A protein has these predicted regions:
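Residues that mark the start of a beta-strand
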Residues: 34-38, 159, 190
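Extended, subdomain-level signal for the structured scaffold at the beginning of enzyme domains
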Residues: 25-139, 147-151, 181, 205-355
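A conserved active-site-flanking secondary-structure segment within enzyme catalytic domains
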Residues: 155-182
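Conserved Rossmann-fold dehydrogenase catalytic segment
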Residues: 180-194, 225-226
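Bacterial N-terminal signal peptides
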Residues: 7-18
Length: 355
């Protein structure tokens, strides 16, 4: 009996070791050639965009992961982290794969270039990406790093995605690329693009699966304690709240505005906001209506009216419709009401649904 218990305990210990430590590869690391993965970093890079893939891809003996930058200087990331790159373009090991993270803006007009926006004007960076892509086995962008791939000419004729807030802009600047919003990452074979931030981890997990199989990817996910859901298909850019146009928020958003609650899905969403304003509910609603009219949305039927005195009625809900670039029709309903008895507090409910 003692011999059986001892044997069982030893087997359990071996099993736990296999699934909990990704570095303990099932094959001998000494007999496998390591894949060099270079992760580009630059001033303004988003932290999770490069550290997420670094953690996942670095969790195993088969990959040698390192950061690379144009110069050896200290990099200041988004949110102020200070990082020293492992290598520069001049002294890096020859990469077999590269990761291009995002951060900052994407070169849109009227803003000071920062992060990716600044790198789009950096010929040394664009040249490194272009020349590396010609030699490596895999290229992956994270977030708005896709704009760097686009500038390097790597997305023409392909399908791609990016972070939710830049989907439409990528489609605008990359007319030869099919830009999608309903996928967390897009695999074109050699070129992989992912959504924003944590989507880079899923892109890295997918790459591990491509390179080493589903089992190795599962083992890695367990080792880094990541709830990997390869079949989930969740995409931030594919959620309906993104269909509420920015000018609506511009009307009521201020330093004291807070999101009270939110529910969002691919075909419908609801947001409840509380804000401070000296406007009455009717005045606030009127300004939101004017904002929607200014961007060519169409007023829909079904406006709800409320008596504010014996002789007047004021709308409390207005509805507007719009057809997006993919031909889908959306309706937004706006409800404005006092948040409390105290003057100067409003509750604004925004609902959007596909119709």
């Amino acid at each position: 009996m003692k011999r059986f218990v001892l044997a069982f305990a030893m087997a359990a210990s071996i099993l736990v070791g296999i699934v909990s430590t990704p570095a303990r590869a099932q094959e001998s690391g000494a007999t496998k050639q390591r894949l060099n993965v270079a992760i580009l970093i630059f001033d303004g890079v988003q932290i999770i965009d490069y550290t997420g893939p670094y953690e996942a891809l670095g969790a195993g003996r088969r990959r040698n992961v390192y950061t690379v930058a144009e110069k050896p200087d200290v990099i200041t990331t988004a949110m102020g982290m200070k990082v020293v790159p492992n290598y520069t373009f001049a002294n890096q090991p020859t990469p077999d794969g590269i990761v291009v993270p995002g951060g900052g803006n994407s070169g849109e007009a009227g803003v000071q270039p920062h992060g990716v926006g600044a790198q789009l004007n950096n010929e040394a960076v664009i040249r490194w990406v272009r020349e590396s892509a010609a030699q490596v086995k895999y290229v992956m962008s994270v977030c708005n790093g896709a704009f760097i791939l686009q500038k390097a000419g790597l997305l023409d004729g392909l399908t791609a995605t990016t972070t939710a807030g830049y989907i439409d802009y990528l489609a605008e600047v990359a007319p030869k690329t099919k830009v999608v919003s309903d996928q967390r990452f897009v695999d074109n074979g050699k070129i992989i693009t992912t959504g924003g931030l944590s989507a880079g981890i899923d892109g890295a997990m997918h790459l591990i699966e491509k390179l080493e199989g589903r089992g190795a990817a599962i083992q890695t996910a367990l080792g880094i304690e990541y709830n990997w859901q390869p079949e989930a298909g969740w995409s931030r850019a594919g959620l309906a709240d993104r269909r509420i146009p920015g000018p609506v928020y511009n009307v009521f958003y201020n330093a004291e505005t807070e999101l009270v609650d939110m529910k969002t899905a691919p075909d419908k969403a609801e947001e409840i906001w509380r804000t401070s304003s000296e406007l009455s509910p009717a005045e606030m609603l009127k300004r939101i209506d004017e904002a929607l009219a200014s961007i060519k949305w169409t007023r829909a039927e079904g406006e709800t009216m409320r008596k504010t005195s014996a002789s007047t009625e004021t709308p409390t809900v207005s509805r507007w419709r719009h057809t997006d670039a993919q031909g889908k029709s959306w309706e937004v309903a706006i409800n404005v009401r006092p948040a409390s008895e105290a003057r100067g507090q409003l509750t604004i409910t925004l609902q959007v649904a596909r119709v």
